[in-house]
A protein has these predicted regions:
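Transmembrane alpha-helical segments and their boundary/interface "anchor" motifs
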Residues: 43, 50-59, 70-101, 108, ...
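Aromatic-enriched alpha-helical transmembrane segments of multi-pass intramembrane proteins
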Residues: 119-121, 145-166
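Transmembrane helix-loop junctions in multipass membrane proteins, especially transporters and channels
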Residues: 32, 36, 75, 102-110, ...
Length: 166
């Protein structure tokens, strides 16, 4: 992929952002179907929208894959920098949420407790996406090699497996 922005990826990114926003609207959006009478058209429309917005995370991951997997011969240092940035964000924000838990009396301070919960992803549930993205970045060199050497038959086989087992 060249450095020029791909318009279709930007459109998909906008769609994914809108889906994430809808997913976080609570009773004013995502859970609106629960305020409708089951079996009515409005119930099914809002239910469909709520289910459809769950497509946002796989869409973001697909966009990341399209952008990052296609880059040939990218230096390992570049990927290490990406990983480092995500780890820093994860450590800093997790520490802030850990301090909040201490302030609220939910736990007492312990470096060991902080590190164990940071590694386990138990400090703040809404940071889960950073763990997912971090796993993607760590796997990126392997995934890139697989993607670059995948022929059409193996790609079709992989898609069939994904559809059947998901």
């Amino acid at each position: 992929m060249n450095t020029k922005k791909e318009v279709y990826l930007e459109i998909l990114r906008i769609i994914a952002i809108c889906l994430v926003i809808f997913n976080h609207t609570g009773l004013n959006g995502y859970w609106l179907f629960t305020q409708r009478t089951p079996g009515t058209l409005s119930f099914y429309i809002y239910l469909f929208l709520s289910l459809f917005c769950k497509f946002a995370v796989p869409l973001f991951m697909a966009i990341s894959g399209a952008v990052l997997l296609g880059r040939k011969d990218e230096p390992v240092k570049k990927n290490a920098q990406r990983i480092f940035r995500i780890v820093i964000v994860l450590v800093v924000y997790s520490f802030i949420y850990y301090l909040q838990s201490i302030y609220l009396g939910e736990c007492t301070f312990s470096w060991k407790d902080y590190v164990v919960n940071l590694i386990a992803g138990n400090i703040s549930a809404h940071l889960w996406y950073l763990y997912l993205y971090l796993a993607f970045l760590i796997s990126l060199p392997i995934l890139r090699r697989l993607a670059q050497n995948l022929d059409d038959k193996l790609f079709a086989y992989m898609i069939i497996l994904a559809v059947v087992f998901n």
